[in-house]
Amino acid sequence: MFHGEQNVQDVTYLNSEQLGDRVDARRAIFDVYFENDKGEKFIVEMQNVYQDFYKDRSIYYSTFPIAEQAQRGNWNYELHDVYTIGILNFTFPEDKHSDSSIFREVKLMDTDSHEIFYDKLTYIYVEPVSK
């Protein structure tokens, strides 16, 4: 899944319930949330049924492990990698005519050069074969 870039040998499970920064803020509950020995964060979501705006939801979820890396005082803003992994039991509408399972890895890209702009934020979606 990580093209040899990750070799997760030790995992520390983190609190899967993320509360907003205000009393009335929306919370998020991840299916699995863990950190590897390098401090990189992994969110794993298993979604059984199609949900409108699932991509938006996964982007929203990724903001929690980013924000929790902030440190008070003198901080240089260096972030650890964040991976949001969606194991889906549905196919995104744009993939509905595919006859094979779809593995999609998404990173921030410069639209002019088509080069990866930022490699520490990764979204991985695994979709089943269309029925």
Predicted regions: what is each one?
Residues 1-131:
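Elongated, amphipathic alpha-helical interaction scaffolds
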